[in-house]
Each structure stands twice: as C-alpha cells, then as structure tokens.
UniProtKB/Swiss-Prot annotation:
Stretches assigned to the MGS-like domain: 930-1061
Assembly with partners or alone: Composed of two chains; the small (or glutamine) chain promotes the hydrolysis of glutamine to ammonia, which is used by the large (or ammonia) chain to synthesize carbamoyl phosphate. Tetramer of heterodimers (alpha,beta)4.
Region (Carboxyphosphate synthetic domain): 1-401
Job description of the protein: Large subunit of the glutamine-dependent carbamoyl phosphate synthetase (CPSase). CPSase catalyzes the formation of carbamoyl phosphate from the ammonia moiety of glutamine, carbonate, and phosphate donated by ATP, constituting the first step of 2 biosynthetic pathways, one leading to arginine and/or urea and the other to pyrimidine nucleotides.
Matches recorded under NCBIfam families: CPSaseII_lrg (TIGR01369), PRK05294.1 (NF003671), PRK12815.1 (NF009455)
Binding site residues for Mg(2+) 2: 298, 300
Stretches for region Oligomerization domain: 402-546
Protein name (database record): Carbamoyl phosphate synthase large chain
Native source species: Ligilactobacillus salivarius (strain UCC118) (Lactobacillus salivarius)
Keywords of the record: Amino-acid biosynthesis, Arginine biosynthesis, ATP-binding, Ligase, Magnesium, Manganese, Metal-binding, Nucleotide-binding, Pyrimidine biosynthesis, Repeat
Enzyme class: ligase
Carbamoyl phosphate synthetic domain, as annotated region: 547-929
Underlying gene: carB
Residues holding Mn(2+) 4: 832, 834
Chain ranges of the ATP-grasp domain: 133-327, 671-861
Amino acid sequence: MPKRTDVHKIMVIGSGPIIIGQAAEFDYSGTQACLALREEGYEVVLVNSNPATIMTDTEIADKVYIEPLTVESVSRIIRQEFPDAILPTLGGQIGLNLAIALAKTGILEELGIKLLGTQLDAIDQAEDRQRFKDLMQELNEPVPDSKTVETVQEALDFAAEIGYPVIVRPAFTMGGTGGGLCDNPEQLKEIVANGLELSPATQCLIEKSIMGYKEIEFEVMRDADNNAMVVCSMENFDPVGIHTGDSIVFAPTQTLSDREYQMLRNCSLKLIRALKIEGGCNVQLALDPNSYRYYVIEVNPRVSRSSALASKATGYPIAKLAAKIAVGLTLDEIKNPVTGTTFAEFEPALDYVVAKIPRWPFDKFTRANRRLGTQMKATGEVMAIGRSAQEALQKAVRSLEIDEKDLISAKAQSATDDEVEEKLFHAQDDRLFYIAEAFRRGYTIEEVHELTKINLYYLDIVKQIVELESELSQNKEDLDVLKRAKRYGYSDYTIAKLWGTTEDEVRNLRKEHKLLPVYKMVDTCAAEFDSSTPYFYSSYDLENESKKSDKKSVLVIGSGPIRIGQGVEFDYATVHSVKAIQKLGYEAIVMNSNPETVSTDFSISDKLYFEPLTLEDVLNVIDLEQPMGVIVQFGGQTAINLAAGLEAHSVKILGTTVEDLDRAEDRELFDQTIKNLGLKQPIGKTATTQEQVIACAEEIGYPVLVRPSYVLGGRAMEIVNNEQELLDYLAQNAPAEIDHPILVDAYLSGLECEVDAICDGKDVLLPGIMEHIEHAGVHSGDSMAVYPPQSFDENIKQQIVDATEKLAVALKCVGIMNIQFIIHNNEAYVLEVNPRASRTVPFLSKITGIEMAQVATRVILGESLAEQGYQSGLYRESDMVHVKAPVFSFSKLADVDSFLGPEMKSTGEVMGSDYTFEKALYKAFTGAKMELPDNGNVLLTIEDKDKDAVLPLAKRFSKIGYRMFATEGTSQFLRENGLFVQTVDKLGKDTGNETSLHDLIVNDGVDLVINTMSHDQEVASDGFVIRQLAIEHNIALLTSLNTADALLKALENRSFATNSL
C-alpha cells in the first residue's frame, strides 16, 4: 500500500520529562519516528516539554515546540500550525493520554485532524481494563479472574469473593503507577484509594494474583494490510509479581519449548490483529511453569520500554518502522535498514543472548523501601550481549556501575542464613547477589527455587557461575579454567580477586597466550543474509567480525544507565560529540551499555560497541580499533572515572588532561589554584578520619556541608547543623578514608548560579549564566533555574565571567566545563568546578543556539573558538526568559523523603519559555504537572525559623484569593499579622479544631502543601509524614520558600488584582 498523500504536516507528541516508568526510551523512539517521517517527505511538528532530549533538537523536526504537554498548550499549537494529522503512539503513556484528552475536547474533529497509527478506539480497548477483558473473553483468550472497580468498597467485595492475594492495576497509567500486590483488606484499601486517584479514568482492575508464573513478553508489529510479525520474544528472570521494568530480562526466551513458544506467539499475533493496532505493540503473558496454561496480562498499544530493549537486542528499529506504518506503508514494502536487502516482514533471528538488568536509585535513597512488586522503581537499565546466558548476565552486572562488579557481594557474604533466605523470599533489587551467595553456602537449586519461584534453568545459570568461582580460586593461572571463565563473562577484575593478584597481571597473562575477545555483529538475521551493521558485542569466541577501518577514529565513552544525577542529558552531549567528530572527517566510535538511548542507535555513529563501561572492556576495544584518542568529557562521572586508568595504559585522553581533571577534583590542588587566582570560595577542609571530620566542623563552625570527594548528583551530601547530626551522617555513609576523603565546607546562604563554559586553552566562551531559584543548600539538579539571570546586576555578572575565564585557563581546560557559584554579600564565591559536560548542556544549547557539545568537541580536536566564529566572554543574552524546572518520581518510591537538600532527587526536567519571567515560570510549573487553580487552598507547615519569611508569601496567597490552613503555631503567628487562617490539628493531636492536618490532606481539602519542617533524619518525623501524605494523595508539594515565591509570581501573573481605592 503506498504511503498516504492526504496528509502533509504531522504533529508528533513527545513523552515529557523523565520519570520512573517513562525514561530515555521515548527520546530514542521519538527521534527515530521524526526522522523516518521526514525521510518519507512529510513536514513534522514536534511538541515536548523536555529540553534534555535529542528529539527536541531543531534538526530532528521541521518545527520544535518545547511547551507543556497539556490540552490547553497543545491545542494552542494545533490552532497555530493546523497539522493534518497527529501521531500519538511514540510519546509513551503521556502522549497517549494527551491524544485521548484532545479528542474528547472536540478540537481534532473540528479541524479535521486525523490520528495516525493505532486508532483511539483500539487504544481505549487495550487500556480500558473492562473493555480489554471483554475482548479477551470474545477471543477466547484466558485472563486472570478480575473486575474493574471505581470505588474501594467494590474492590473489597470482589477480593473477598475470589480470595487474596490480589493485584491492583490502575487504568491508563504506566510503570505500574499506583498499583501493587495486596495480601489483606488493609493493604487493598490503601492501594486502591491511591490507584483511583492516580488513574485518569478513576478505575482500577482487581485481579487474582498469578504470582510464580513465568512472565513472557512478545514485541509485535502490524500494518494496515493485517500483516503481523514478532520482532522479539523476551523472558523475565523474575516470575510474575515483579514489574517487568524491575525484572532481569533475557532475549530471546530461554526456557520455552517449541510448542509453548508457538502457542504464545500465535496468541500475541491474534491480539494485535483483533485490536487493529498499526505499528508496534507489547504483549505480556503469564505461563504456568508446570502445564500449558497461560494468561494474557496486558497489551501496551504503543512503543514502550520493552520495544526500545527489543530494538537494541535485535537491531530491528521498531519505532522507525512504526512511524512508516502509521503513514500507510506495509511491512512487505519497507526495507529492513539493517540488512538493506530483506524486507521488514522477516522476523529477526538471534544467534546470541541478551540480558537486561534494571538500575535502581537505592544508592542515593538509602532509606527507601527496596521491596520489588508491581510498581516500578528502577530509573534506568543496562543491556549486555553474549554467546551464552552466563556471559550476558555477568557483563550486565558489571555494566550497572554499582558497588558490586560481579556476583560476589560483601553484604551478602556477611549475612546470616536467615537473612539470605529472607532476601530470597522477599525480592529486593539485590536478590541476584543473595541467590549466588545461597549457592556458595550449599543450598540446592530446588531450595532456592522454593524461596524465589525463579525458573530452575535461570538458577542453574547462576549456580554454574558460582561453581566456576571456586574452580578459579583453586586453579590459579590455569589457562583452561581461565578460558572457560572468560567465556562465562568473568572479568579480569573478578579473576584477579579470586587469584589474589592484580587486574593488569590477569590481562597480561591473557594477552601473552592470545586469549582475546572477538567482536560479533548484531545483524537481525543470525548471519543468514549479508549484513553490514556497524553494531558489535564482545565474546570469547572464534571469528572476529569487526574490522578496523583506514580512517582516523575517535572513541567516545557514553554515560551508562540512566540514574539520578546522571540522566539523558549526558547522552545528549555524547550524540552531539559524535556529530562533530563525523563533520571533521574522523570515524566516530561509541561505547555504551544503555538500551534506552539515542547514542546506542547504531545509525548514529560509525561504529557502536554495546559493552560494559569498565576499564577492561574499554581497553579491549581500543586494542582492536587503535583510535587516535578517547573523549571522556560527555559521559558524566562514568567516563571521567575511566580517564586515569586509560592514561595509565598509555591511551591518549583528548581534551583536558588527566592531571588537570584531577586538579579540579582534588580538594587541596583546587584550593591552591583558587588562592593563586585571588578568587573567593567558602572555607573548606578535607578529612580522612572521623575525628578529623568532627574537628574540621568545629573549626569552621556549624552549619557545615559534608560530602565525599569525587561524586556526582550530590550523593551522600548533607547540611548538618550540630555534632549529633554529623555523627548520624558518618554512621549512615562510608567513614572517611585516605582513598575516600570527606569534604567539610562552611555553608553560606545566598543566591546560587552556574555557568557552562568552553575553553580552547586561550579563549573562554560562556554561552550563558543560569540563576537558581532555590537558595544555596538545594542541589543544582533539583533547583529551578532561570536564564538570563533575573537578580544579578552587571557587576555580579562580570565577577562570574572573570572568575570563569581565570579558572578555565588556570585549570588548562580544553573542551567543556561547569562552574557553580554562590552570591554572598554581593560577591561571587566559587562552590565547585566540574571539568566535563554537565546536565545543563542541552538546556543552554537549546536556548542560545550554540551546539555546546559540538563546539567543545571541535575544540578538543584542535579547532579554536575563534576559528569557529566565537569570541571570549559571555554570549549575548536572549530576549526570551527560559526556566528549567525539576521533575520528581516520589510517588513511585515509598519512604524517600521529598524534602529538598544537597542530595539530588529529581529524575527529569521540563522547560518553560516566554517573554516575561512570570509567564516562563507558569509554563515550567505547568510542564512539571503543578497545575493550580486561580483560587484554591494552601496548607502551611513551617519551621519556626522560616515564619518571618513566610509572612509576605502568605499575604500574597491571601491577595489572590487562596484560603490558608496552618497548625497552631504558624496559624497564630499569621493571624497576629492580620491574616485569616484556619487552624488544623497537628498529626496525632485532637485539640478540638474543625479538621485535622491528616484529614485535610487525605480528603483532598488542599491544592498545595508548603512544608519547610526540616528532615531531622527521623523517618517518622511530622515533616516527613506530611510530605508523604501529600505525595500519596497527588497534592502539589513545595519544601522551599524560594520555590513558593516563584509559584506565586506565576499565579499572580495569571489572576487579576482586586484592590479597594
């Protein structure tokens, strides 16, 4: 069927900010789709609120709008652009829900706008729990006993009828939001109440639990001619009961017989045809491990996290083809871009095994509830490819960049047998390490299966890895055992640990005996057809398929899995670095381990190595490719941490040298540089013992800021007010050591700001200064930022520019760097310097038009700023005002305190742009889903020290017609100052007031909670409980008065003043 000619301009809806359950995979799929539509000759208009994406680059679509993803905002753009059609299935759940909401307003019908790809009715049928169940019964496909409910009572009645445990699944949500497993009525009441609140349709499905079944996924495609095919089958290591986004996953399926595979494949194809889905779709199935009985769990009628994984696992570009199907092309007329010869209807065949492991944020949230269930908690994931499941699994573990670099966990080793069994029975993020530990202690596969319900095959894989461990320990330098270990994915690091030697010695032994990895191609067809994809993985196999080219090449190290503190922004910088390398005529080679990102799309670079980002794996690629150098500035802390090891092996680090990187990161060297330049910084000390930490704090004077050296995202960083808090901090975090010193700084109050700068060794370009809206003490990644600055005069800007130029030249920065300042008493103090790309690069690049990562890469490769047409100093400021706002995923992480401080907690960001600060703020708040009514209710729970500061804010709330509620102390203070405030009872206190704080929040009596009650390290503190209640009930929450001030500016700008004469 030829492509559509009745459509010329297509609007693509993006997925908005990164949150748990909806991460970088939609940047990848959205980018692919826009490029595919343009390739077919259509004009593309893109709407997305997330500036940190490749998708929102001006060359991806004909027109790019970075605006809030709301009905009001998108309707405005539709009336401005008049697209012929909208493609909503590539923007995740956000894009789908927005398309449904737009259709309900009647605007699509009014303007004759078509929906491309899967139609609304099909989306509704797959997403509406009751309609989906009815369709399954019509098709005679089994679903677990279930009922759609709209009240808590209905849920309780149905659960009583079918018996516990039951699973709750809210409709039209993603990442298992608001869902969960319930063993009793109390849990059910709580989870259903929350689920109904979070479901746009206010409905939940209550279903009989089928925990312990195998969880199987099929990624399927269908076109308008009803051709359908399976792209990839995937099997969860964890049985049903743990969200697939929190499960280890293998592709292709490993434990299905041919009969089981065909049965589930046929079911998946039957479903996609019955739902009339056009494009990609994900089918989740549960299979009884002891019979041929299966159930359909759900269908996602859109491109999803699993489709990004399936695309990278097979090399088959699902989103690209889904976009082409949406405009009428069929699978039998689209060429497979990988082989270039076969058509897209050929099902991919894999001659390797892929393992995916989720990356959780619990290293940052040590107090979070780590139990895994039906609600997703991972922020990202890693993928590894091997010739065996053992190899893929071990490579994936070392890709995670956590404390454990293999299956040997010190924590698991020191646990008692009871603790090990508890960890096996109640799944947490670290269960895999405890399974390995159980086998070390002599537990049988059957005993571990009884506790975990994990398939015997997968347990056997772990057991084989553990058995080889003891063989390695007993046969030091035995080449046969070494060969087997390398085929099982063992790293030199682990082998060295078991042999009691060094990693370099193992490496030298391997090289001496020619035991080297080869690189295999990912070609979608198991080598059945000729293929020339530049997409490789390593294995200790026979034939090497990756040939070094004659061109000079540069290796760019990616940033690994998405986690808090190191998000999609670094992938953005990596992709732009690759573009610059290619424009200068070099071959660009990328190494990365993240299946969700644009950088691991093999069409982006000249060669892609999908490998763990460890020293051994990077050196192996360098041995083969012999690049002229390696760029580490764009891969976040992951890449920077590899620099010293690479240099020690005589690898050329391009750009800022390792010695100069070290000078910026090493406290004493840095302090010396600051002193030599005559710049100011807060008083700071370095301590290597606990006693020293306490002595330093005494000497500087409380409050102090304490943090470990060499971290990203403010991990383990805290403001402490007295010695007791300092002792608590040291007990919670690793003690100070010679190798890992702790930094103690004076805590200065004032306005924070940051700059990104590009330096060629002589000239220094500052694309812009970003002022933080929250005062010092809130991590820069969690702070709202505004460009150009609103509170700085020319004198302060000049101080910042002078300090930046001096530092960049003195630190011999070649490439990009980020500096954070605090403005205290009208003077700029240097807080920290990061000699690499920071998370603000995409934001600043978009608003200034300077492709910062590309400019920096050209500098790194020897082209000066002057040769690129830039001069030293601050780039001209834009006429518009741009605000970057953080977005959090607290609703997915129980027990994480939402009080903002120096430890970063946000998962994503949005941007608001307009001609006034207030309007830009309003758009940023709206984009971050903080949509407040013109006159609503606000609850103020304020620390004593903040009462004076809250008074002017309370007066402004009163002026725009907000009703105020507060507990006794705050209420009395505000009433004494002439304001009308309703007093509410404190938590757990009944003092005869009309309502209590608890009931006010639980019964949705307020629209906004402002809570500055400090996090006194007590999980049960009132402040913490209030914040948790607000998050559970989906109520806007602010913990900083600066943010409240900004929100008021936005609200005041929207409402009319009413003053008497």
